[in-house]
Amino acid sequence: MKYPIGIQNFEDLRRNCYAYVDKTNFVYKLADEGKYYFLSRPRRFGKSLFLSTLEAYFQGKKELFEGLAIYDMEKEWKKYPIFHIDLNTANFREKDSLYIVLNDYLTAWEKKYGARESEATLALRFKGVIARAAEKEGCSVVILVDEYDKPILQTLSDPELQAEHRAQLKAFYSVLKTQDRYIKFAFLTGVTKFGKVSVFSDLNNLTDISMDYRYISICGMTEKELVENFKEGICQLAEANGDTEEVTIAKLKARYDGYHFEAHTEGIFNPFSVLNTLTKLRFKDYWFETGTPTFLVDLLKMHSYRLPDMTKERASDDVINSVDSLSTNPIPVIYQSGYLTIKGYDERFKKYLLGFPNKEVEEGFLNFLLPLYTSAGSESPFMVDEFVRDVEAGKPEQFLKRLTAFFASNSYQVAGDAELYFQNALYLVFKIMGFYTQVELPTSEGRMDILVKTSDYIYIIECKLDGSAEEALQQIDSKNYAAPFAMDKRTVIKLGINFSSKTRGVESWKLG
């Protein structure tokens, strides 16, 4: 079986007999029921391949669809002129970079359909070439845009250039409304929705199917699709890792499944990671390794975000679908980028419960954040395995000595809320070690800062900033934080830690 890793061209995939999860029923449904669509999905989730599938369909290439769902659904197989804009590969961090890319597309189309000197702007040229294409071919045109938001995402740190990109895109896309009579179908994709309102404000008939129940599995794959299409590969993966087929499916599910794009829907597997795992026969963080979420980290720092909240974030429909909210809330972009997903829904308060979709994303994201809190590297005193041994063995003194060295080695400059920084750092340490960790756990008499559980020990940790370790330990006792574990057979260890905002490290610690 040939796995289409990196293959984003539908014709290439079909003619070279790569494995394909049939999504053509969605192609027919979209073309049959509507005209203008927008789809938001994380990167490497199959958006480009789906656009290419649409392109082949509107080119009337019936032979490519033999054996697929749409083959007998469609009767006409007409050919339409297609304007396919791919913004995924270009660099938009320089002035005029977006203009250059759009100009290149227009120049190529004008060679085929003609140009006019009076069309002085990108928008006017686009408007003119659409009309001439429709007149020349005798039919309406199809417009496909891949990664509409790439110019906006790449200029988060340059508001002036981002505003320039937005203005150009808004004028360019406004043509889709003014030239409606010449357009048969339009489909636009992106990672995020922010900017959609300002960029597409003139295109008020754009249907957003990102959270539409009918299109949840339009990209990616369900467990049923995984098992039905890749049974041979699953068996090979099981044999290579000494597991049964059932255990292998469970491992794939835990590591790569878990994306939910609407409440009460089945999970969707990350196709890129699944295909790489079946090819290389090893479970690794393939999706995460292809792109580091630098802009998301910048957002978290900008908003002084509490990392523990990422596993219990609650958000309304308006929030996770909001746009242009970077200045007030990082959650919409983090969700839309695929680092958070819908884990549940509170019917009473109409709130989505968000969290990491799977192990790949959680472990990858937390490990990516670690260098922000320590000079982590091969020579760093922060060695996860040593921390794990200390905590599992019930050696808090050793653990605290390593923790002190961990902060002492840190070159990161604490900005803003120092207490938040230390809390985030401790949370990262314990989560990366793989321990059950809760932060600010409510009790009958207050909130304990950090609770860590292993098979043999329960650690109750109270932290103070510019206070004293004794004060922290006293709070554990006075608030009776250990009471809920009185009947637990595990040993309870109480730790009081005092951090210094001046030295940016552990000033003192005390065991109880």
Show the residue positions of the predicted features.
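Phosphate-binding site recognition
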Residues: M1-A418
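Mg2+/Mn2+-dependent nuclease catalytic core
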Residues: A163-A167, L465-A482
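Structural motif
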Residues: V142, Y457-Y459, I493
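Metal-dependent nuclease catalytic cores in nucleic-acid-processing enzymes
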Residues: F172-Q179, P332-L340, Y427-K431, Q475-L495
